[in-house]
Amino acid sequence: MPKYRSATTTHGRNMAGARALWRATGMTDSDFGKPIIAVVNSFTQFVPGHVHLRDLGKLVAEQIEASGGVAKEFNTIAVDDGIAMGHGGMLYSLPSRELIADSVEYMVNAHCADAMVCISNCDKITPGMLMASLRLNIPVIFVSGGPMEAGKTKLSDKIIKLDLVDAMIQGADPKVSDDQSNQVERSACPTCGSCSGMFTANSMNCLTEALGLSQPGNGSLLATHADRKQLFLNAGKRIVELTKRYYEQNDESALPRNIASKAAFENAMTLDIAMGGSTNTVLHLLAAAQEAEIDFTMSDIDKLSRKVPQLCKVAPSTQKYHMEDVHRAGGVLGILGELDRAGLLNCNVKNVLGLTLPQTLEQYDITVTQDEAVKKMFRAGPAGIRTTQAFSQDCRWDSLDDDRAAGCIRSLEYAYSKDGGLAVLYGNFAENGCIVKTAGVDDSILKFTGPAKVYESQDDAVEAILGGKVVEGDVVVIRYEGPKGGPGMQEMLYPTSFLKSMGLGKACALITDGRFSGGTSGLSIGHVSPEAASGGTIALIEDGDTIAIDIPNRSIQLQLNEAEIAARREAQEARGDKAWTPKNRQRQVSFALRAYASLATSADKGAVRDKSKLGG
């Protein structure tokens, strides 16, 4: 029978000092036999996805205390990728994932907490907490802050839906008037919550649901809606049950590594492909799998991408649907229900509620459930009122979207495309693979061949795009922006947005060893591995080289013979200490980022730290 970890600090005369300190936090004698549950919050006023979380930790803590546990809350950092975008701040985004994972480990292990409730929401916070949870392998439940309502405004006598990406594109489009750009900017992000499309934050919160580590509705129920409060209340109660099951009944099924099994990871990736999620999810799932010591690799993702269709299409791939529409159509479990009927899921998995996947679908799939409370929950809709307050409205759709032929979520028969929303490409400069969000690629450019325009930083590429130096038919190559080379693997949302604003969204390709925002669409290929700074062949591409992209056949090729590539590699190596570094880039890199770069692996490994360099 496992012993409560917290007993290390609460029992025995030699822990009198620790108990004295616990008492100073408000604990009493009656608390020193109860499980100590860490409430891992991420409130900050910097991030709209986290600005409303201040009081939500208290909600969870009250339920933990009422259920027989002791709640202790702490906070992690949280970077807003949208605000950090387009300047040096983006270098810090991906490295913050590792800091978040480490900080959770440090706090939980230093104070011997028995379990966790993770209150996350945005891009690197959910992945960082997920990595920590699987590293620590103690009972955990995730409950995120929820999606933002979609922005709405009237343009040309028509009400349209908006999000952050629209504001960026219109702001950079010289054909858009100042008045219209200002109108879109003021309407794009109306409430608290994670940005309203199927961007990285919402993708990851959907995936924690598919992994079984969060409750039904977690990925899609709006941040502003009163129904979301119940997820927080339930999490506080349920975590105490899970904790006691493990420590008092020796039930290892309560542990995250037994819930988020390899089968669950495969289900999560299947969901991601079917819903056209952010390419960043590939990076984060690979990293989380390594923390769980699960053999889940790019090869597994490639196999799934070849058989899973696209059943859901959401912004930024279309402006017709946002997360509020996904929720109305049944949310994550609506998509999983269709995947299950198509025979594409592993059913031998459970979630934090203790339900198997078939049991969960029976209760929560809106096309089959008889539970009126569930149907009511999925009718939770937007209010259209600007607010930073959680649970501030109780509006509902008049009806559910259960149209699987022409609605937001489709059945296999009526899939948006036979191929899923993500694909892994391989070739002679992406030997370990690269990722493209096919959900955002126009059919006319699924096959594309053109001359390379090579840039050794995102900044240089943006300057060239806005300066008219990139023209129709070009393949923009941005390198030395990988985990090691950036360092930090910047998102390339500005280059892709500016290609659109210059009218080149369907006329050019963009390839990088960096990554893309979940808001990216177009022929944008990222995560090229190995990256340039690790000796990847992408470092050898020159202006004018022909690059051929063939998404249907999962191929990407630099059209040079092996002898020429070998000669260029030899010339690169001859640069000595300067080999595999950018030639003319002016970038100040802090000590903290250099430390990150010294251990960073390429994207095909999830950009995690290279443990082989640590010894032991």
Curated annotation (Swiss-Prot):
Entry annotated with the keyword Secreted: no
InterPro entries per the UniProt record, alphabetical: Dihydro-acid_dehy_C, DihydroxyA_deHydtase, DiOHA_6PGluconate_deHydtase_CS, ILV_EDD_C, ILV_EDD_N, IlvD/EDD_N
GO biological process entries: isoleucine biosynthetic process; L-valine biosynthetic process
Record keywords: 2Fe-2S, Amino-acid biosynthesis, Branched-chain amino acid biosynthesis, Iron, Iron-sulfur, Lyase, Magnesium, Metal-binding
Entry cofactors: [2Fe-2S] cluster; Mg(2+)
Top EC class for this record: lyase
Binding residues for [2Fe-2S] cluster: 122, 195
Domain of life: Bacteria
Keyword tRNA processing recorded: no
Residues recorded as bearing N6-carboxylysine in the entry: 124
Coiled-coil regions, chain positions: none
Binding site for Mg(2+): 81, 123-124, 491
Pathway: Amino-acid biosynthesis; L-isoleucine biosynthesis; L-isoleucine from 2-oxobutanoate: step 3/4; Amino-acid biosynthesis; L-valine biosynthesis; L-valine from pyruvate: step 3/4
Cofactor note: Binds 1 [2Fe-2S] cluster per subunit. This cluster acts as a Lewis acid cofactor.
Active site: 517
EC number, UniProt record: 4.2.1.9
Enzymatic reactions: (2R)-2,3-dihydroxy-3-methylbutanoate = 3-methyl-2-oxobutanoate + H2O; (2R,3R)-2,3-dihydroxy-3-methylpentanoate = (S)-3-methyl-2-oxopentanoate + H2O
Cellular component annotations (GO), alphabetically ordered: cytosol
Similarity comment: Belongs to the IlvD/Edd family.
Job of this protein: Functions in the biosynthesis of branched-chain amino acids. Catalyzes the dehydration of (2R,3R)-2,3-dihydroxy-3-methylpentanoate (2,3-dihydroxy-3-methylvalerate) into 2-oxo-3-methylpentanoate (2-oxo-3-methylvalerate) and of (2R)-2,3-dihydroxy-3-methylbutanoate (2,3-dihydroxyisovalerate) into 2-oxo-3-methylbutanoate (2-oxoisovalerate), the penultimate precursor to L-isoleucine and L-valine, respectively.
HAMAP family, per database record: IlvD
Binding partners and assembly: Homodimer.
PANTHER family (UniProt xref): D-XYLONATE DEHYDRATASE, D-XYLONATE DEHYDRATASE YAGF-RELATED
NCBIfam families hit by this protein: ilvD, PRK12448.1
Stated name of the protein: Dihydroxy-acid dehydratase
UniProt organism field: Salmonella dublin (strain CT_02021853)
Gene that this polypeptide is encoded by: ilvD
